[in-house]
Amino acid sequence: MTPTSRTPPERAAELRQLLNQAAHSYYVLDTPTMEDAVYDRLYRELLDLEVKDSSLLTPDSPTQRIGGAPAQGFASVPHRIPLLSLDNAFNVDELTGWYVRLVKLLGYQTNPKTPQPDLSMVGELKIDGNALALSYEHGVLIRAATRGDGANGEEITANVRTIASIPLRLQLVHPPAWLEVRGEAFIPNSTFADINTARGERGDVAFANPRNACAGTLRQLDPKVVASRQLDFFAYTLHLPDNWQAKADDPASPMNQWAVLQWLQAIGFKVNPNTALLTDLTAVEHFFKLWDEARHQLPYATDGVVVKLNDLQLQETAGFTQKAPRWAIALKYAAEEAPSKLLRLTCQVGRTGAVTPVAEFEAIPLAGTSVSRATLHNANRVSELDLHSGDTIVVRKAGEIIPEVIGVLRELRPAGAQTLKLPHICPECRSDLVREEGEAATRCVNNSCPAILRGTLRHWVSKGALDVDGLGSKLIEQLVNRGLVQSIADLYALEASLLASMDRMGNKSTENLITALQASKSKPWHKQLYGLGIHHVGEVNAKALAKKFPSAATLANAACKAPEQITSVFGVGNEIAQSLQQWFATPANQELLAKLKQLGISLEANEDELAHDTDQKQRTVSLQGQTFVLTGTLPTLSRSEAQALIEAAGGKVNSSVSKNTSYVVAGAEAGSKLNKAEKLRVTVLNEEELLKLLAS
C-alpha cells in the first residue's frame, strides 16, 4: 500500500512512528538514521494532516515538542510518589557511616570493605541540573513536573515536550496503566556557552552556570524559548504499579537498579553511560576518585556521584526518612577553592537587625559559578581573619553552594596595608549599630530600618509562614522603596491598581497576588505566630506555643503577666519567654496586631486546630531514664532546642558517648561522637527520628 492509498489516520500513525524512531536514534542513540531533508519533509506532511484534521493530533506527535501559546503560569501538582532529595556525604568517613547504618538497618553483619553480593550498589554520576518527574499513562507522556517541595511540584509539561531526548511515547507494546520516570534535565556545556554568547550580543546578563540556566529555562512561560535552548535529559529512576509484569513482547521487568537503567534505555530514554556496579565501599571509593579526576572532561556539569543499593526489594525494606531515601546517598566532590583579591567589606542587614559582614572580591569562577561575594558570618570571624586592604583571600564554595572566606595569604599582603574594620553605621538607615556584650552579632536597632522591614515582609510571606505566592523579594523591595508598605498589615490594604503599576506586575499577576493575600488570612494560628518573626521563635516553638495559647491575646497575656506559663511549654525556655515579653510589650507591635485583626487575620486557632490539639494532649511522652548525646547540625532545631525537647520529655542530654548512651542524635558534619556511637553500636537518630520518638 502506497502512502497516497492510506487513510489520513493510518498515514498519520505511520509518520508519528517513523519520526519518533528517527528522533530517538538521533538524540538518544547518537546514530542518525534519517537525512535531515527527509525528516523535514515527513514532519511537514504530518503537520499538514494534523492541521486539516485536529482529531489526528496526539500527545506523542513530534509536532507537539514545540509548544503553542505561552502559558499564564504553572500549576502546582502532587507527585504520585514523593520526589525526595538525597542525603549528602562530603568525605569517605561520612560515606562509611551511611553504609554501616544501612547494613545494620537491613540486619546484615558485614565489613564495609568486604564484597557482599546481596548488598551490591550502583554508582551513577550526579548530574548538576534540575530533577524532573515524568508521568506516563498507557505509554504516553501526560505530565511533567519539577521537584518542588518533594510532595508537590510545578507542572511544566509543555516545556518538557520540547526536550528531544524525552520520549513522548514509550517503546513498549503493552505499557502499564501508569509509569513514573525521574531524571535530570540539564544544559550541556557547549550549549550553555552558545546561550551566554547570544545573551551577551543582545545585552542580556549572562547566566552564572548551566544549572541556573536550566532552571530558568524550565520555568519559561513560552515553550518556544525552551526549545531554542536545547535541553537534554538523563533518566535514572523508575516507578511501576505494584505487581505489574512486562509481557513477552517487552523488556523483562527490572528487579534491581542496574536493570532499571537498562530497562529505561530499552523503552526510549537516554541513560548516562558512566555507571558502574559496585560490590563494596572500596569499589565506591575507586568510582568516586575516577570521576573526581575526570569530571572536567565531561560535556556536562557533575557535582558528585550517587550511590544506590542495587536490590529494589532491599531498597523498599530500608525505606525513607522524611527528606531522603535511606538506600542512596550523594557523595559530593570536595569544595573548590580559589584565591582572589579582596576589594572591600560591606554589610547586609537581616529581618532581626543582625548585621552580617560580607567580603566583596574580584570575581572568580568557582564550582561552575562566577563568585564575587562571600559571607563572613559575624564580627568575630572578621577579627579571626585579620583582613587588610588589598589582601589575597582564599574562597571556598562549601558543598559547592555557599561561598565562604577560609583564609588569607598573608605572604601576598601589600606593604602598608591597613586593617579593615566593619562599619559602625547601618548601611541602610544610617543608624548607629549596637553589639551587646557576649554576642557575636552586631545589630541595627532602628525598627524603621528598610532592611529590617524588607526581611520582616519576606518572612511573613515565606512558605513556613503565610506562604503568599507571587510576593517575591523584588516586589517587596519596590513596595518598601516607594514607601507604600511600612508594616505587614499594609500588605492587606494594597489596591489592585497600585500593584498593577509595579514593575513586571500585569493584571493577571495582580489578581493572583490579591487572591493569595486573601487566602493567607485563614492560615493556621501557629503559622501566623511564626510569621510575626519574633526573635528565637522558630517553626517548632511556634507550634508548641500555639497549642498552649490558642490566640495572640492569650499568649501576650501570659508573656507579659505570667512568664512561668511560657516556660512550662514543651521545649520553650527563658530566652524565648523574654523575647516574647519584649515583643508583646512594644507599642508598635501591639498596634500591628490590632491592625491585622481589623483586616480579617484572626490571630487565633480555629475549631479544627483546637480539636486537633485536644486530641494531641491525650498522648503522653516519657523518656525517663534515657540518655542522649547531640552531635552535628540538625536541619531545623538548634542544639538548645533539641536539648529542651528531650529534657521536657524526661530524658537526659550528656556531652560524651559511652556504652550507657541510649541514643546519639546526629546532624550534618557530625564528628567523632558519631564514629564512637557506631563502634559501640549505640542507636543513631536523625532529627526526624528524634521528633517521632518524642511524639510516640
Swiss-Prot record:
PROSITE patterns: BRCT. Residues 618-696 form the BRCT domain. The keyword Transmembrane helix does not apply. GO terms for molecular function: DNA ligase (NAD+) activity; metal ion binding. Its cofactor is Mg(2+); Mn(2+). Its EC number is 6.5.1.2. It is an enzyme of class 6 (ligase). Zn(2+) binds at residues 426, 429, 444, 449. NAD(+) binds at residues 36-40, 85-86, 124, 147, 184, 308, 332. Belongs to the NAD-dependent DNA ligase family. LigA subfamily. DNA ligase that catalyzes the formation of phosphodiester linkages between 5'-phosphoryl and 3'-hydroxyl groups in double-stranded DNA using NAD as a coenzyme and as the energy source for the reaction. It is essential for DNA replication and repair of damaged DNA. This is DNA ligase. It comes from Prochlorococcus marinus (strain MIT 9303). The lineage of its organism: Bacteria, Bacillati, Cyanobacteriota, Cyanophyceae, Synechococcales. The gene is ligA.
